[in-house]
Amino acid sequence: MSNQVIDLLKQLRQAAIARKLKVLIDYHEEDSYLMRFANSAISLNTNEHLIRLDYNAFEGRKKVSYSLIVDPSDLESMEKGLDILVQMLPHAQSLSYEPTFPVYQKDVFDESAYDPALAALSNQERLEYFNTLAQGLESDDIKLSGIFSNGTTITAQISTETEHTQYFRSTDAQVTAVLSSESLKWEVNAEQSAQKKSDLDAPALHEDLSLLVKHYLADKAVQLPVGKYTVVLGPAATAELTWIMSLYGMTGQALKQGYSFLKEENQGDQLFSSLIDLTDDPREAEIFGQAADRFGLDRKPFPLISEGRFQAFMWDQDSADEFGQKPTGHDVGHLSLVIDGGKEQVASLQELLAMPREEDILYIPYIHYMNVVNPSQGMVTGSSRFGALFLKKDGTIEVPYNVRLTQKFTDFFGEGVAWLSEKQVAYNVSSSYGRRNPSALKVPRFICVKEIEISHSNPSY
């Protein structure tokens, strides 16, 4: 497979040189599978195999791009795309800066995040996985829905400057299972990210779903008073908050365009809890890390927060060119963010519920419809959903109706952080739309944060 891709890129490079074009050629191939469930039945089972080419032509301060979905045997159509670039360049407006043209100094071949067993997963295995996680939990009132998405992604690059190529292949799976009560209108869910087949663990999801359904059926449903609570975040909430925080606050582009909540002078400042260490770590195959970025820069661990101190901004090549900065190897389709684990020995939902409690704790596994309210202040909002629990000091458990949180990133990850689980898990944040781009974070199983304010509390589910 890799030889076919590289041979194609080299043919296209020669075709571009013959047209006197200075071109970066990006190759993207996906083999994607999706099984969707609704009302305790398969509602969709589909797959697609797509190959895309992205051409970027450079001429001084001019840059134009053209993309197409291709048949790999139809070289003529691909070369017509190059002809379109020739026609576009004279009409392009010059940029205010000189964009860097990639000059690859070596071949890069990276399949560290590829697993042939996951790539070959069958429909029967996907169905058996869902049957296992939902076994004994469905009823006339409680219905199963969700998705099982998995696939293989290949990306590769070549430029007209050298014959060196970059080639990356990875496999991924993203599972979301939801059980909902048609009469009471509550929903609970469980999720899993996988880079290899052995990561798939349907019994673990069944255990979490069983526990949540048990409490949602038996425990009292309550409207919580607004106010401040000690909150335990699940991996979904932690990962989504971290993902948005990194994109809105920790990139050079966000800094220079004025919407980051961090300033240049904040580098080195203690803005977060000393328990928080956040790194973009491309060595982590579990979260689809890759060895080099799109411009050929070697990817190395890049500390963003060290013991609570903000370290540095991430610079992609184009932003670095525009603002006169040094790129940091972040011209990638996705980051590989890791929050280090802590010292708390709590590795499962069952263990969290069994912990002795000195105060009431609001468990929020997932923050729904998360949005940035004010990026320059780092303020986000979202509501609890899919399995929140109110763990009372007296040992009892109640089921809270949805609540809204509107807080700053520094509230979630600041001095209020009480503890982090030692156990870490991968959480998948891949989009279901557009081209396949496996994305995940590695975060503590639980993070406990004090003084999180509930600004609104629903009177029902």
Residue ranges of each PLM-predicted region?
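Active-site bordering "gate/hinge" segments
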Residues: 1-290, 297, 306-309, 431-437, ...
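Dual-mode signal for accessory low-complexity, basic/Gly-rich regions
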Residues: 266-461
